[in-house]
Amino acid sequence: MAQEVIKIRGGRTLNGEVNISGAKNSAVAIIPATLLAQGHVKLEGLPQISDVKTLVSLLEDLNIKASLNGTELEVDTTEIQNAALPNNKVESLRASYYMMGAMLGRFKKCVIGLPGGCPLGPRPIDQHIKGFKALGAEIDESSTTSMKIEAKELKGAHIFLDMVSVGATINIMLAAVYATGQTVIENAAKEPEVVDVANFLTSMGANIKGAGTSTIKINGVKELHGSEYQVIPDRIEAGTYMCIAAACGENVILNNIVPKHVETLTAKFSELGVNVDVRDERIRINNNAPYQFVDIKTLVYPGFATDLQQPITPLLFMANGPSFVTDTIYPERFKHVEELKRMGANIEVDEGTATIKPSTLHGAEVYASDLRAGACLIIAGLIAEGVTTIYNVKHIYRGYTDIVEHLKALGADIWTETV
């Protein structure tokens, strides 16, 4: 079957500006959250990615009027109807699990296919289920392809998450906004996207306090009205372009950034010796290789993002000694390593830690196993000698708006082909 590949002829110096898109990890939760509104919602600043289109079509399956126009989405829920959500759309998208919390909150019942997305080893939704049960829901998991969640009544509860989970924190918030009484989430995730979803729900009349801290309190309300809301910029897309600029950029400017959200990466760039200039909502970066070797350990926010450990890896081949990258969040998130070896990389992985030594990369045929691995391979291709061909690029399009066009505009020799 014909498929699209991305091809890159490495060695070009990039310069120019990129406008960072709205946050994928906010958008994929805020779009399901619109079904909690009773009326009309307008979202602005959405990323133009396939995940957004999939979620909009799931809203339409619930008889919601939804109009997606570029970065804007208008939603009218006045004729909403509960329906079982089929598996073919749901399984392509992990964040479809936010439909569970939103539908449980709105209808007290949902039947939904089991979610998919990037294969990153164990990513169970047990903390989500724990939260739903605490609010009074019963879960029927007898089917292998779908899950039925139902509650006679949703009542506020005190919920302690056994592990910090962005998905569970948001999903419990969605289910709890209409619950009677107060819900308290302890050990809640503090990510900016959690705050963004809470701010959106608050804009519709929800009563949520403490988002961005480890304790979130939700007082249930009777009704959520419509709202207009602007999604925050994507800190992972910003971080990825920061890595691209540090690898092969000369005076690359990134606009629409919240500097606080990329502080950990900026600090790591200082250790590496990357030339970074931060002003208000823009960052200017120059390649300043060779870099200093560093150690990186991923942690929950505000620590170093697991989503950036793959994109930063190609930079470490340009360092003056061995670097170590440990992923404490997803210790199996190293499928890019074998692909980088095809390009001549001196890299080994053992028990969740990669050892990365200075290397000269050459073009090769490589396979994007997941979204951020794909970003890593693009950056590797940009600094490699010769032509790199990346297969399975659908993962890349799930998370990066027009990345090929953006890189072309910066001067990269990059194109797509159907093979």
From Swiss-Prot:
GO molecular function per UniProt: UDP-N-acetylglucosamine 1-carboxyvinyltransferase activity
EC category name: transferase
Pathway this chain belongs to: Cell wall biogenesis; peptidoglycan biosynthesis
Keyword Protein transport carried by entry: no
Location (main, coarse): cytoplasm
Active-site annotation: C118 (proton donor)
Classification via Pfam families: EPSP_synthase
Residues involved in UDP-N-acetyl-alpha-D-glucosamine binding: R94, R123, P124, I125, D126, Q127, D307, I329
Top-level taxon: Bacteria
Location of 2-(S-cysteinyl)pyruvic acid O-phosphothioketal modifications: C118
Catalytic activity: phosphoenolpyruvate + UDP-N-acetyl-alpha-D-glucosamine = UDP-N-acetyl-3-O-(1-carboxyvinyl)-alpha-D-glucosamine + phosphate
EC number: 2.5.1.7
Entry keywords, A to Z: Cell cycle, Cell division, Cell shape, Cell wall biogenesis/degradation, Cytoplasm, Peptidoglycan synthesis, Pyruvate, Transferase
Localization per record: Cytoplasm
Biological process (GO), any one: peptidoglycan biosynthetic process
One Gene Ontology cellular component annotation held by this UniProt entry: cytoplasm
Chain sites annotated for binding phosphoenolpyruvate: K24, N25
Protein family (similarity comment): Belongs to the EPSP synthase family. MurA subfamily.
NCBIfam families documented for this protein: murA (TIGR01072), PRK09369.1 (NF006873), PRK12830.1 (NF009470)
UniProt-listed PANTHER family: UDP-N-ACETYLGLUCOSAMINE 1-CARBOXYVINYLTRANSFERASE, UDP-N-ACETYLGLUCOSAMINE 1-CARBOXYVINYLTRANSFERASE 2
Annotated function: Cell wall formation. Adds enolpyruvyl to UDP-N-acetylglucosamine.
Protein name: UDP-N-acetylglucosamine 1-carboxyvinyltransferase 2
Organism: Staphylococcus aureus (strain Mu50 / ATCC 700699)
Gene: murA2
